[in-house]
Each structure stands twice: as C-alpha cells, then as structure tokens.
A protein has these predicted regions:
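Alpha-helical recognition segments enriched in aromatics with Gly/Pro capping
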Residues: 1-104, 223-225, 229, 252-253
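A general alpha-helix detector
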Residues: 40, 53, 57, 96-100, ...
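Short alpha-helical scaffolding segments that buttress acidic/His motifs in well-ordered protein cores
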Residues: 57-58, 100-101, 138-145, 152, ...
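Small-residue-rich helix-loop
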Residues: 110-210
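Intrinsically disordered or highly flexible coil/loop and linker segments, enriched in small
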Residues: 63-67, 85-86, 106-110, 126-127, ...
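Charged substrate- and nucleic-acid-binding regions of tRNA-handling and nucleotidyl-transfer enzymes
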Residues: 197-259
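Amphipathic alpha-helical interaction elements
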Residues: 46, 102-106, 122, 126, ...
Length: 261
C-alpha cells in the first residue's frame, strides 16, 4: 500500500487504516482457485445457496466468536470485529457450507422456502402446479439436500413421470423383489383410508407376513416409487401419491423385473 499512502498524503486526505484478510485455502490447504473449487458467488447462488449462507461462510473465514457457527446479518453487524480476524490462511470447506446452508434454509418460513425453490423447479421443467398436494410434497422434501437445486432435483419423481431406476439401487434391492411388490400392493389396495398412519400399519403387517427385515421390504417399494433408495419415511412417501399412482408405479416396477428376467 505505500503508493496509495503517498497519494493520500499528497492530496491532503486523512490517513486510512488498512486491513488484510487471510488467504482463502481449499480443503487441501492449498490456495483456493478455479482449478480445484467453485470460486464464483454466482455459481453458488445458481446451485441454491442462500446469500445469507454465503455471508455467514465468508465472515467465518479467519474470524470466530466462541463456538458459534451460524450467523445472520444482524448478528454479524453487532459481533464482527475486523481486529479479531486472524492472519493465517482460512479453509473454505464446501461441506461446511452445506451445513451452514442447511441451517439457513431451515430458518426460512415455508412460504419463503417455497418461493425460493420455485425457480429451480421451473428450471427443471417440473409442473408442480398440477399436484393439489404440492406444498405437502415440498414440505416433506425440503431438508433432503443442503441446497435448493438439490431439493428440486429430489422432487423430480414427485412432479413428473418416473422414467428410470438407479442402477445400483435396483440391482441391490429391486431385482428379485416381485413377491414383496405384489404382497405390499395387495395390502395397500385393501386400505379404507389413504394416509400415512394407515399405510405405515399396512407396511408393518406386510413385514410381519413376509418375515423380512425392514430394508428388504421398504427399499423395493421406495425404488418403485422414486427410482432410488432416498426418500422420507416410506409411509409418508407413499401418502404423497394417490393410490392410482402407487399402483401404476408398482406395476411398472413389476414389468421392469419381468423384462429384466
């Protein structure tokens, strides 16, 4: 800064105080660069990280306040002191950003969360308006991923036709599950009330009737409904679809198994 200081003196400006922030490092403790990490704020926003999360993350690089990790703008305005920033390199850990963003997303009201999510649903071509229970589906899935794009991608099976199954999941749990699918389908079709509690009861009865451990019963059904082994509790997952759609997807899974054999 010597040149700037001389110019300030020559112009008669009062001397400024300078502060240096620590160098930002990647998880490998090498200087963060485009070659080993996403370095554009816009790229993070495009993935559905909140502005408040990025401010939180960046403010914590080289600065801390006890063991507190989650800060909102008002917190930082009152707590942040540039004098407390350390000189040593600060690590930008994407997994920590995920954790911080999870907290900031959870703090949003449902309406705020949904409004922020909608552009990501639109970008994936998901017609969420066709579902009368779209808000219920979004509420069930809102914590499935640490960013809005990930949540939107997880919602694809709920707002569009299921076109494929995860290969690894299908090979591990779906192949050979014809008896499970047919047995559970009969149980579900015998329900008088279609809600999470009644579905859970039917699943428990099916598990007892087939003498199977939970994964052997639940995962084939979960894959048939969503294409993967990742979803909320199975009773809740099934309740997000109507019985007609459940039958359609179980029948499609049975056809897939028949064609595979």
């Amino acid at each position: 800064n010597p040149r700037q200081i001389h110019i300030q003196h020559a112009l008669g400006y009062p001397p400024l105080e300078y502060a240096h922030l620590p160098m930002v490092l990647g998880p490998d403790k090498k200087r963060l660069s485009k070659r080993n990490a996403v370095t554009s704020l816009q790229d993070y926003f495009d993935q559905g990280y909140l502005e408040s999360s990025m401010i939180n993350m960046l403010a914590r690089l080289g600065w801390s306040k006890g063991d507190k990790e989650i800060f909102y703008l008002d917190d930082l305005i009152s707590d942040f002191r540039i004098q407390e920033v350390q000189k040593a390199g600060a690590i930008f850990d994407p997994s920590k950003l995920d954790w911080i963003n999870n907290h900031h997303l959870a703090a949003l009201s449902f309406d705020d969360f949904k409004n922020r999510l909608i552009p990501f649903l639109d970008s994936l071509g998901l017609d969420y308006m066709q579902k009368q229970n779209s808000s219920e589906i979004i509420a069930a899935m809102r914590s499935s991923k640490p960013n809005l794009l990930g949540v939107a991608q997880d919602l694809i099976p709920y707002f569009s036709e299921l076109s494929s199954y995860d290969d690894k999941a299908a090979n591990k749990f779906l192949i050979g599950s014809e008896v499970v699918l047919e047995y559970v389908q009969r149980k579900l079709n015998g329900l008088e009330d279609w809600n999470e509690d009644s579905i859970d009861k039917a699943l428990m009865e099916a598990q007892t009737g087939l003498s199977l451990p939970t994964p052997k019963l639940n995962q084939p059904i979960r894959i048939a409904m969503t294409g993967s082994t990742q979803s909320p509790s199975l009773g809740l997952t099934l309740s997000l679809f109507n019985l007609e759609e459940v039958n359609k997807r179980i029948n499609a899974a049975l056809k897939y198994l028949f064609d595979t054999n």
